[in-house]
């Protein structure tokens, strides 16, 4: 079984709406989307190995503080990713995968992981379409329990800027002379 290596590990609040997630960004993504914000992680084999013991230790450390584990990539190592997802679900946490693949492509590459996932983000990054916070995006964020696409949770109403008129009025003279 091949190993997964991560270049970033962090607690995130925005990537999975309504969840506090422990996120791992894996190296070695073969998709290489133009404009990718994680291009520095494309090189295979860089980073720290995510072992079963390491993951269990992190889940223990953050018990009660996180509700989800987010894997950014890793679907190119389906057996290893499935094992990690099993650890997450056994710990009673939700699991999310961010992939640039479409769902049909993911099923063809690593069909065994879908039953372990609570959430799935699909779609290659296309700069001209924007990310999940864009109404024109090609990407989808799906709650796999219900099949509902949750993109609306990423799009913030952007109110018109509040304009406060500034007027300069001459101040009354404090002292009047006679």
Residue ranges and their predicted role:
Residues 1-25, 30, 38-44, 175-178:
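N-terminal [4Fe-4S]-dependent radical SAM core
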Residues 24, 33, 120:
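Conserved, mostly hydrophobic/aromatic
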Residues 33-41, 63-66:
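Short, basic/glycine-rich phosphate-binding loops at helix/coil junctions
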Residues 43-57, 76-114:
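Canonical radical SAM enzyme core domain
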Residues 56-63, 107-129:
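Structural recognition of alpha->loop->beta junctions
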